[in-house]
A protein has these predicted regions:
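A helix-coil-helix interface module used to build multimeric assemblies
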Residues: 1-185, 189-203, 226, 239-241, ...
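Short conserved catalytic/interaction loops centered on acidic-Pro-aromatic/His motifs
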Residues: 168-176, 209-217, 343-348
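Glycine-rich cofactor/substrate-binding loops
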Residues: 1-20, 230-395
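Catalytic cores of enzymes that engage adenine nucleotides and/or redox cofactors via long glycine-rich
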Residues: 186-189, 209-243
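A short secondary-structure junction motif
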Residues: 78, 82, 125-132, 201-202, ...
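Short, intrinsically disordered, charge-balanced linker/junction segments flanking boundaries
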Residues: 196-211, 391-394
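Short linear loop/turn motifs
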Residues: 41-44, 210-211, 336-340
Length: 395
């Protein structure tokens, strides 16, 4: 029931899982977690598995959970305990994500190529029929002369807009999540830049932590509401309203698409209704952003959260990694720590040392700020300001 169609869908990801593992273990060898003599053997076997995937012969056996487990099982059958080491410094989270990103990157490339082919065909038809006139319509009424050249060319031009979206999607996809583990980094001294380069990513995802637990942050009193019967309550109503408003805004593309649904080429009065959903959305979004900035400025964080013994098990990964760094195969270290926790014998070492890019000890905020600045610089707002000022200036 919980697996659903995962095993079937994972076949799409098989060869990308192999590529991700090849980059990951190459990096692990560089930091001493895989032996120099082990790496060539692992890489050769992964290349064999890649060939199986490429031929369409890869299968996930009965009783095997997913593609990641199948690849590791195939390695372990051939190479023994050596195959158990490939998961060191990785979580299912960043492993799944890198597979999806590699798959999406390849799929987007195919779509870009096919879009360019369609574009070329439309331009060719536009040139071929540029002198052939046709009626132009508005409201499905004959309006003005047009041409097949203009008609085909208009659809070709619309594909350039689509190409901008594809480019944005490609840039967002082409970032390396390896090293983020379950979302909080790893205590292994991972070289994330190395896996970024090996897989041809433009950059890495520096920080993929998106969620918060209850009572980890304290909201300002003026931004919460109480209860009529429960005096202890501080409800995050403002954030709940922001969530609802933003969810409503996310529906905007669907609303616009449905309003335009089934309209042929030309102008129709249906399009007037788009203004009613489009124009007010910006005011709502600006209000949400302003309120978020106001609250974030006043948020306080609790500094003593992890003193509570209930959180001791979250340090288990650090212990697994410590054992792996001392030579124990990752899967065996994982099993040992799990048994210690189950027996009540686990005493955590709460001194954690994360150093790789995007981890607790190396946030890379300077790179994130530089990325944001480069994106802001790409808007060239000053060009618009200069043009508008020139128009408004007295002559």
């Amino acid at each position: 029931f919980t697996v659903g169609k995962d095993r079937e869908m994972d076949l799409y990801l098989a060869k990308y899982d192999v590529l991700g593992s090849m980059a990951h273990i190459t990096m692990l060898e560089s930091i001493g977690l895989i032996g120099k003599d082990e790496l060539p053997l692992l890489l050769d076997e992964l290349r064999n598995i890649y060939g199986i995937c490429d031929r369409g012969d890869f299968v996930i056996e009965d009783g095997v959970e997913d593609v990641h487990s199948q690849v590791e099982l195939m390695l372990t059958r051939k190479l023994g305990d050596m195959g158990k080491k490939i998961h060191s410094g990785r979580s299912r989270n960043d492993q799944v994500l890198v597979d999806l990103k590699l798959f999406t990157r390849a799929a987007l490339r195919d779509i870009v190529c096919q879009t360019k082919t369609l574009f070329d065909e439309l331009i060719s038809k536009s040139e071929e029929y540029k002198d052939v006139l046709m009626p132009g319509y508005t409201h499905l009424q004959v309006a003005m002369p047009s041409s097949f050249g203009l008609w085909f060319g208009a659809y070709a031009e619309s594909l350039t807009d689509d190409m901008l979206y594809l480019q944005a999607a490609y840039r967002m996809t082409n970032r390396n999540p390896l090293g983020s583990a379950a979302g909080y980094g790893s205590s292994f001294p991972l070289n994330r830049q190395m896996t970024t380069d090996l897989l041809g990513f433009d950059s890495m995802d520096y920080n993929v932590v998106n969620s918060q637990n209850f009572q980890i942050v304290l909201l300002p009193k003026e931004c919460t509401t109480g209860s009529s019967i429960m005096p202890h309550k501080k409800n995050p109503d403002v954030f709940e309203l922001i969530r609802a408003k933003c969810n409503k805004i996310q529906a905007l593309p669907t609303q616009v698409t449905l309003i335009q649904n089934n309209l042929p080429c030309g102008y129709f009065r249906d399009l007037q209704i788009i203004k009613e959903v489009f124009l007010p959305a910006f005011d709502e979004l600006k209000d949400c952003l302003a309120m978020c900035a106001y609250i974030i400025n006043k948020i306080k964080v609790r500094r003593d959260i992890l003193d509570n013994p209930m959180y001791d098990p979250i340090f288990s990964v650090e212990e697994v990694n410590r054992l792996a760094q001392n030579g124990m195969p990752f899967r065996d270290a994982y099993k040992k720590v799990g048994l210690d926790i189950e027996a009540g014998n686990f005493t955590p070492d709460k001194n954690i040392h994360h150093t790789h890019e995007g981890s607790i000890g190396n946030l890379c905020n300077d790179r994130i700020q530089a990325l944001m600045q480069s994106l802001l610089d790409g808007f060239h707002f000053e060009k618009v300001d200069e043009a508008e000022s020139a128009l408004l200036a007295k002559r």
